[in-house]
Amino acid sequence: MFSSKSTTRPTNYSLRKQTPNSKRANKTRPRSSLSSQVSIKAPRRKPRETTERFREHIENFSRDLRRVSDGESLGETSDDFVPKKGRVVVLMFTQLADFDSWELAKFIVNDIDLYERNNIEVRAIGLGTVEAGKSFCKRTRFPQEKLAVTEEQDLYRMFEYSPGFGDALPVKLPGMVKLLLMCAGIGSPGTLKTVVGGYFGSKNKKPVLVEGSNADVPEVRKLMDLTLGKDYLRPFEMATLRLANMTEILNNWDELVCKNDQLLVQRGGAFVLDDDRVFFDHRDAGILGYCDPNRLKEFAMIDGDPKEPFDAIEIMHE
């Protein structure tokens, strides 16, 4: 992740307007002359106190967690589900009829082979029943053996994940009302920006509708390839994926949704563990605030001790 790349690049350090007489005009300086001589060791962000008790929380609520593959409670086998040794990515999905869970699951499936080749385990916990978990895995292609489910939000509370809009109100609102308000951006930071971004696309992001991808929508992708080109996130591309997900979710709503409607707005997060120590921790701020799978992958693939300070100069030039 932290490999050094180029050798030199043109750099203009003068902020003044240059004139023909300026002896400094158009000069270049090797980037490596700075980066090879200066090293700034920056400490990594200290994990939240509750994440340092990750294993304790998992064990305390292990009887509420059921493996989707066989429907059995984790109980005393929680160490087998989330290994104590090695590198492990743990996804805390929202409820299984949620946009976030579907998008993240589809993207992660694309990377599972890469994780396995690098001896990195992937596990997920989601809100719902075992039957909902089976339906979710069938439709997103997320492996059943890597997913456990719970119908309680206690574990999510222990990890201090946002319970969603309206939790502190004196009046208990119906879960669907809270969900609609959050979809409109109320009590859900960043949601509207992310939704709008899905319509505009970005030249700086990779496409999501790619042949062979788990998130592909072939009919739309082929049309976009012909009319808008390839190799970047095209306008309406993310919106197309979200529309496809929404259609499938609504068509199978009764199979997927939690009985407790208050779980409709419960947010989740993600961890990366190294020998049972959390060194990466993400909390969803709102709807569509799930962890960027590429960022998750970068942290999971860090070489050496992930707790060691990193070279800020080297990272700056990545």
Spans of features found by a protein language model:
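A short beta-strand-turn-helix
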Residues: 60-88
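Structural microenvironment flanking redox-active thiols in thiol-disulfide oxidoreductases
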Residues: 103-141, 151-155
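Short acidic, S/G/P-rich loop/turn micro-motifs used as interaction or catalytic elements
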Residues: 95-99, 130, 287
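N-terminal chloroplast transit peptides
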Residues: 1-28, 32-40
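Cysteine/selenocysteine-centered motifs that mediate thiol-based redox chemistry or coordinate metal-sulfur cofactors
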Residues: 305-318
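Short active-site neighborhood of thiol/selenol oxidoreductases, capturing the structured segment around
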Residues: 80-111, 121
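Thiol/selenol-based redox catalytic cores and closely related redox-interacting motifs
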Residues: 150-286
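A short, polar/charged loop-to-alpha-helix boundary motif
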Residues: 286-306
